[in-house]
Amino acid sequence: MNVKSQVTITGIVTDESSKPLNNVQVHLFNTRVTTLTGGDGLFSITGIAAGKYTIELSAAGYAAVARVVDVKGKDNNPFSFQMKNLLIQLEAVTVTAEKKEELLHNIPVSITALSSRQVSEFRLWNIKDLTAIVPNMYSGNSGDERNVTSIRGITTTSYDPSVATYIDGVNQFSLDTYIPQLSDIERIEVLRGPQGTLYGRNAMGGVINIITKQPTNSASGFVEINVGNYNQQRYSAGIRLPVIKNKLFFGASGVFNKRDGYYTNEFNGRSFDRQQGITGNYYLKYLPAEKWAITLNVKHQDNRNHGAFPMVNGIDEAFNNPYRLNQNAVGKMFDNTLNASLSLNHSGTLFDVASQLAWQNNHRYYNPPVDGDFSPLDAVTIVNDFGTQWNNVKVLTHELRFNSPSGKSSAVSWTAGTYFFHQYIPGKQATHFGKDAGMLGVPDTDFSTISTTKGKNTGIAAYAQVNCLLTAKLTLIAGLRYDYENRKLNVFGEYQKDGQDAFVTTPDTAASANFNAFSPRLGLKYQLSDNSNLYANYSRGFRTGGLTQLASDPSQPPLYPYNPEYSNNIELGLKNNFLNNRFSLNITAFLTHVNNAQVPTLVLPEAITVTRNTGSLTSKGAELELSFKPVKGLQAEYSFGYTDATYKSLKISSNGQEVNLEGKKQIFTPDVTSMFTLQYSYLLIASKQIQLVARGEWYYLGRRYFDLANTIQQSPYNVYNTRIGMSSKHLDVFFWARNITDRKYIEYAYDFGAVHLGNPGTYGVSVKTMF
């Protein structure tokens, strides 16, 4: 950029009484420019081009503010900003849902955004804790921490998810390689509805976008301790600091988490699902020159679960004898994940560019094996500890993205990019049938069937999206993405009698398949006023196709291809801010049609998922989100979601016969989700920002089903949480309790009847110091 075209932005930040505010963070959207105000409340930003910029201000104890400023190509008078106490005003919410920084209020997409403060207030430790906070979202697991997530009736039930999860820009490629634990979070964004244009494969239900805190010129850190019942211990810490000011930055955070099991194993009288794990997140950021940034990020998670599948056979057993089971095989799950990325960002005069290369690796195995019959019988166990070369998933991805430049005054803004991935999945698993196998109808005993698979998947994509200002109030959004994927799978089957050599039952066989998909988007946004936006969208998403695995059941042939699943969505939305940013109200209505629906079936006893394309699904509903600060210190939040997700056609095979399940409801999809929170904060000592805080939360989840025939169901129920304590600038002390009434409910169930209950009532104390 020509030096003569560079200009300077200056400004002053004050509070409601016109008192200058010190140490306010000032950030220019979609740039690496961040600075702080001095003791006089003044800030200065140099070396930028003339144009329109969004300036974001944030400071402890104050509601974040964002405002568009028009920077002229000459000396500019200082811009004045006023920040109000967080106790009386809602914050401006920044999101990167569309691959660039924007205000939530201005984006014509259904999004729930949670700030770092809200993540702490809700006490969110795991992605599944977002259930009902996000309208029409449900997430749960069978005790193995691999969450099944449903948004608007689009449900993840296989290792290729239908709801994509991104952490710091990296697609958590499958349930094998994603990290569900939450720590040191900057914000969480949940996009509802198909997001295929910008996010591609497996975003047909939506996207969970998680951003962790990165280091800046301001040194900061925290230490937090949580202790509670069930011997819950959670220790977390983080630090962010400049190594060389304006040049090199370092950040690190980590969590150690352990607890006793919620379940007791009556077979040995011991706690069953004891867990402990370590999660780490490390940043090294380098600014080699003006407008350039290089960021290295490494994440890891190492979990140990002493009883990975705390499940019982049937609903009656689950509720009549809650949190007790009887399993003779107590499998210990080792789950080790490493995710690393290298990002390069440049802000240019013609366009901004971002490149991100990422590597993901997960090795998960059971030692000793896990119980496959969920009973005290020595009948079925699942064995997969065959060394590090097996069940060790590896993924390489690269995204190259271009954006229209920041600050450029134009009626058109755009985003375009390419995406590449390669995935290697070497799997080996044995199903062992013990001396009691005959009691389950197995004609032989003391033998194993061994399935070996090697999968290689490679894909490329190109995408573009344009926002065009048609009039001063009307904006057109249009986008298109093309994805191509090649899948290869080798299968090999063996039979082995205990103490004898194995012999081949299925020779080494290979197959491949190619899949492609177009994902368009078309939308309109109309600005009703400065505080209200109306929008309408059409979007398409898809879940990739694949090849079936190997099972011992001859009716389930291996290497059978199944095609991609597609969702087409139409939605209308209205976003409003009222009463000087004290009241916000967002409303959405949607209609989604899914064709070529993938229906996964868990084949027993091998615990292998076989997928077929069968049927179509229609999902329709509405959503509402409300935030209100009626008086100083009091905040109310409410979310509501209604989903009617019904199969319009669904024919499956059961016991050798075709069964028509037309009219059945989608699984893992509550018909209603509702959440209400009320929090009161009393400012005790203003100079030290000491507040007394009391918070209550109410969750309601409607009826949901866990099998396609709708025979396994959970009736509607309520859950209540609370958080009470003291907050200050440098120290927080809180008592928290979740599921106060100890409500028993089904969190997860397999279609063959195995049931896992949701967490019982838990409580604890949290102490956090910030510096």
Regions found by a protein language model. Name each.
Residues P78-F81, I127-L130, V148-R152, Y166, ...:
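N-terminal periplasmic accessory domains that precede
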Residues D168-P194, G280:
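Short acidic/polar hinge/loop motifs at secondary-structure boundaries
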Residues S220-F222, V227-R259, Y263, F267-H306, ...:
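Transmembrane beta-barrel wall of Gram-negative outer-membrane proteins
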Residues K285-E290, F402-P405, S413, T418-F421, ...:
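Structural signature of Gram-negative outer-membrane beta-barrels, strongest in the C-terminal barrel
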Residues S343-G348, D352-V370, Q527, N533-R543, ...:
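Membrane-embedded beta-barrel scaffold of Gram-negative outer-membrane proteins
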Residues N403, G417, L591-H593, R612-Y705, ...:
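Gram-negative outer-membrane beta-barrel transporters
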